[in-house]
Design a protein with these regions (language model features):
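Phosphate-binding loop/pocket of nucleotide- and phosphate-handling active sites
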Residues: 2-23
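Alpha-helical scaffold segments in soluble metabolic enzymes
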Residues: 5-12, 51-58, 126, 147, ...
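Secondary-structure transition/hinge residues
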Residues: 14, 18, 60-64, 181
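Positively charged, low-complexity intrinsically disordered leader regions
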Residues: 24-91, 95
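Thr-Gly-centered strand-to-loop micro-motif
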Residues: 40, 158-159, 192-193
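Phosphate/diphosphate ligand-binding glycine-rich loop within oxidoreductases
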Residues: 67, 71-178
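Glycine-rich phosphate/diphosphate-binding loop of Rossmann-like nucleotide-binding domains
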Residues: 83-95, 179-233
Length: 233
């Protein structure tokens, strides 16, 4: 317990002295999305979501080409940091990074020093010293991507943090719905199952309601969050 408290104190101290950071990515003023990180769906407004969907549609055609190679991210270094098992999300990010020309490093929990007892803070500090451009993070702790974004110079993409959020999955789901129906306003969406512990459900509720969909949830009362109506359901 004392060790855990010491870790928290060390993290808080590090956060306080890590405010003067510079990011390698410049904000593109032509895009509606002008933020460094992608961590929470609930912080995305309608224009930002539509910006992601518009850009994503370009790569649907790109992925149908025989030669799927771009230099858009040439010279950029991306770390895939997956501290939970994943197949679809991890490989999707890996394929995307490589097709866009980035240098990609995959780090799994079993391959990291965290597996030997090193703190996440120490691991992130070490990786940050390698000057990465993007960190893609999957972790069982809620809010961890936000914490990491405050101690590194790289852009952070949340690939799932506990039962909190999974914004990229929700954006993909929104793109699928757009391809099928061509609109969002007036659509009635039902999300079924364990809503309380589903990060995908939470992110979908945030993004789809922002786009104008009517959201309904279906599941046992014990698996529905008590504050569900505050989420726009």
């Amino acid at each position: 317990k004392i060790l855990e408290e010491a870790k928290k104190i060390a993290l808080d101290l590090y956060l306080k002295i890590s405010n003067n950071k510079t990011h390698s990515f410049k904000i593109n003023k032509n895009y509606a999305y002008r933020k460094i990180h992608l961590i929470e769906s609930k912080k995305l407004n309608k224009k930002e979501i539509e910006c992601f969907l518009k850009e994503s549609e370009k790569y649907i055609k790109f992925n149908k080409k025989t030669l799927k190679k771009s230099n858009l991210l040439k010279g950029r270094t991306i770390f895939n940091l997956f501290f939970e098992d994943s197949t679809r999300t991890r490989t999707s990010f890996e394929v995307a990074a490589k097709r866009l020309g980035a240098d990609l490093i995959n780090v799994a929990l079993k391959d990291s020093s965290i597996n030997k007892g090193e703190t996440l803070l120490d691991t992130m500090t070490t990786i940050n010293s390698m000057s990465p451009d993007v960190l893609i993070v999957r972790h069982p702790e809620e809010g961890i991507s936000n914490k990491i974004s405050k101690i590194v110079n790289a852009s952070v993409i949340n690939a799932g943090d506990g039962s909190h959020e999974h914004p990229t999955q929700a954006l993909l789901d929104a793109l699928t719905i757009k391809k099928k129906f061509g609109k969002f306003k007036g659509l009635k969406i039902a999300i079924c199952g364990d809503i309380k512990h589903s990060r995908v459900a939470r992110s979908n509720i945030e993004i789809l309601s922002t786009l104008g969909c009517s959201i309904n949830v279906i599941g046992p009362k014990s698996l529905i969050p008590k504050d569900i109506q505050k989420m726009g359901v």
